[in-house]
Every structure is written in structure tokens, then in C-alpha cells.
Amino acid sequence: MNSPNPIPNDTSIPLWITQSAHHQADVFARQQPSPQKAEQVYRNTLAVCVGNSYLKLLGIQTDVTASDSWNAVIRLASDVADLVVVGHGQLECRAVAPGAETCSVPLESQCDRLGYVVVRHEHQNTFLVVLV
């Protein structure tokens, strides 16, 4: 069961989605058994990539490859979009559609997280907006 959380509207930071992020999302999505799961994994992967870029801009060290979202078995079995913040734990990166007023967080991602980064897809996936 997902828990909806209100999304603040006061600040946002637009970040371009790199070709590398699109490529990684495509690779992970193609490994999925259904179109629905592929779309979920694609959006989650883009959210993690943009969350990673955002934290790097802030000078925060991350290890995306140590994240559950980079583990093929966990990615297949769960709705994960985590990013490891080195020395601190996992940050959840969630994507929402344009105009969304809530962000659903799956049960498996509601505990043991440092916090949440919510990104909104804009302009046919050319960039995501980090909602702060």
C-alpha cells in the first residue's frame, strides 16, 4: 500500500536528464517482465539519477551502484528508488507526474530512509524538477 504525501509548491530546481540517465533507465526497463513494471523502473531510475545529480551539486557523496535500485533482483521484486548517501544511509527518490499534488511512497520505502527527494517529470522527459 502506498502512502500519499503532500508535495510542497514553493520551491523547485530544474535539472536536465542526461543521455546516460536515459540509457540506464532503458537498460533497467528492458529487463522487466511487463510494460507496467518497465515504466515504473524507468521512472524510478530517472528519479534516482536526477537525485544523484542534485546531491552531487550540493557536494554530497553518493554511491548509486550500492543502492537497492541498482540491484536487478530487488528492482524486479520491489518498487525501489533509493540512493545511498555514503556514510549515512539511503535516500528515497520518487517521481511524480506534472500537476501531481501528492507523492506515493511504497511501504517498503517508508522505513530506514534518511529522507525523500521528489522529482516531477517535465517536457517529455527532457528534465526533471527537484521539488524542495
Annotate the PLM regions.
Residues 1-87, 93-132:
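Nucleic-acid endonuclease domains
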